[in-house]
Amino acid sequence: MSIFLKNKQFENITSQEQTKNNYKQLINDIQTLKKDLNAIILAHYYQEPDIQDVADFLGDSLGLAREAAKTNADIIVFAGVHFMAETAKILNPEKMVLLPDLNAGCSLADSCPPEIFSEFKKAHSDHLVISYINCSASIKAMSDIICTSANAVDIVNKIPLTQPILFAPDQNLGRYVISKTGRDLLLWPGSCIVHETFSEKKIFEFQSLYPTAEVIAHPECEPTILKHANYIGSTTSLLQYVKNSKKTTFIVITEPGIIHQMKKSCPEKQFLALPTVSGCACNECPHMRLNTLEKLYLAMKTRSPQIEIPESILLNAKKPIERMLEMSN
């Protein structure tokens, strides 16, 4: 081997060691700040693995809302997207809530502009408004009850049959709820860009490659996708399902961040993230992936960016969230 190649190899090893040391130091700094600030890190399953591993609590929207409602921490660092951090602030108006990147929005939340939704609601004033938690604080403030993918079916089932329901903003989750409850819901035409990238073609391809695999999917997917699923559920529900299943191979149809926890829980099993038709990384949420360990550290160090919500919106948005938590207990 030439001296040049040896030197290059040494440089690569040195660089890798430096990166590893920097990573360890970053983790230590985050843990120190967390203790000094009496902070808690809440993270969604769709976050990158490094953030999942440093979180104090990891969960789906319902679990995160419950945790935010009961935390004794002074500062909540929310590793998720904007509407999730807003929910934490609504439940804890006196606490500081930090979001590592304020640009971490949500295509589903953006598909329901408050001004337009307000007019839609007025046109159907006899309807009870049940909104999926994946919406802005302004939409929550116009809602009667909030739901998540984990409890949407149960909540709708608790509403009297004579009461018309307006369900927003996810039409795909709404269609799933209709299929499970038999209710005639009025749906707002919103959707998640990630969960609409999947195709039947790719399901068939993967099923031919892995004939014994079970297909598991999130209810934000389109009906044409869900009809091929052996199991449909929220991220927490999907995780619990693979833990209990006797099957060893799963085709996972949702944002692939959840697979990190599936592999940790069941290292002996195989989890296959269903790709999009184009084969790009479009099944990864671009908003969730804006958060990084470095941004999380900087948010704690600088106490910014903070989530702020006008008091009038905050107070009105809190009622339907609390009603959801009461109905889910």
Curated annotation (Swiss-Prot):
Pfam annotation, one family: NadA
InterPro entries: NadA, NadA_sf, Quinolinate_synth_type2
Record-listed iminosuccinate binding positions: 44, 61, 132-134, 149, 218-220, 235
Top-level division of the source organism's lineage: Eukaryota
UniProt KW keywords: 4Fe-4S, Cyanelle, Iron, Iron-sulfur, Metal-binding, Plastid, Pyridine nucleotide biosynthesis, Transferase
Localization terms from the record: Plastid, Cyanelle
A cellular-component GO term for this protein: cytosol
Binding-site list for [4Fe-4S] cluster: 106, 192, 285
Enzyme class, spelled out: transferase
Single GO BP term: 'de novo' NAD biosynthetic process from L-aspartate
Entry cofactors: [4Fe-4S] cluster
Location (main, coarse): plastid
Keyword Iron: yes
EC number: 2.5.1.72
Keyword set includes Secreted: no
Associated pathway: Cofactor biosynthesis; NAD(+) biosynthesis; quinolinate from iminoaspartate: step 1/1
Protein family per UniProt: Belongs to the quinolinate synthase family. Type 2 subfamily.
General function of this protein: Catalyzes the condensation of iminoaspartate with dihydroxyacetone phosphate to form quinolinate.
NCBIfam families: nadA (TIGR00550), PRK09375.1-2 (NF006878)
PANTHER family attached to this UniProt entry: QUINOLINATE SYNTHASE, CHLOROPLASTIC, QUINOLINATE SYNTHETASE A
Name of the protein: Quinolinate synthase
Species: Cyanophora paradoxa
Organism ancestry: Eukaryota, Glaucocystophyceae, Cyanophoraceae, Cyanophora
Gene: nadA
